Regions:
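Nucleotidyltransferase catalytic core that binds NTPs
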Residues: 1-167
Length: 167
């Protein structure tokens, strides 16, 4: 971590380049990561096993609101989400992004492996399909891999928020 919000985009890009120059395999994943739960951790741990260094991109607060997660989301501000993610041993770098998708980060970092959770499909080519992995076409073009890891059963931030609100 460089500051409370994670690496700046440029510093993260330099770090990724440094790792690549050391012939380390760079893995990239992204998400909101609000109300962290064991399902998030399992995806991150699985992602980390796909390479040597794991970069996690976190949606900014503004991005989360635009993604229609609800007017009261995220629960935790981006600085808290980034710091919590950076504390995991399996995570090597965290960067917050303000766009609706991480496509520009994927294109800038050029990871060797792009990882998403099991609600996505690695071979989905239709960018309008909710199962489409953003950046997958690019990663495959430069010879990288797209990996989808199984989700932990019964783990959902949205369901947890609903449960809390209804109790």
């Amino acid at each position: 971590m460089v500051d409370g919000d994670g690496y700046t985009r440029d510093v993260a890009a330099m770090q990724v380049q440094n790792w690549k120059e050391q012939n380390l395999k760079v893995v990239f994943t992204n998400g909101v990561f609000d109300l962290l739960h064991v399902g998030h951790l399992k995806v991150l741990e699985a992602a980390a096993t796909c390479g040597d260094r794991l970069v996690v991109a976190v949606n900014s607060d503004a991005s989360v609101k635009r993604l229609k997660k609800g007017p009261n989301r995220p629960i935790h501000p981006q600085v808290h989400r980034a710091r919590l993610l950076a504390a995991f041993r399996c995570v090597n770098a965290v960067v917050v992004f303000d766009e609706d998708t991480p496509l520009s980060l994927v294109q800038q970092f050029k990871p060797d492996v792009l990882v998403k959770g099991g609600d996505y499909e690695a071979d989905c080519a239709d960018s309008s399909d909710p199962r489409y992995v953003v950046g997958s076409k690019d990663v495959k073009l430069w010879g990288g891999q797209v990996v989808v890891v199984p989700l932990a059963t019964g783990q959902s931030t949205t369901a947890t928020v609903a449960k809390i609100r209804n109790s």
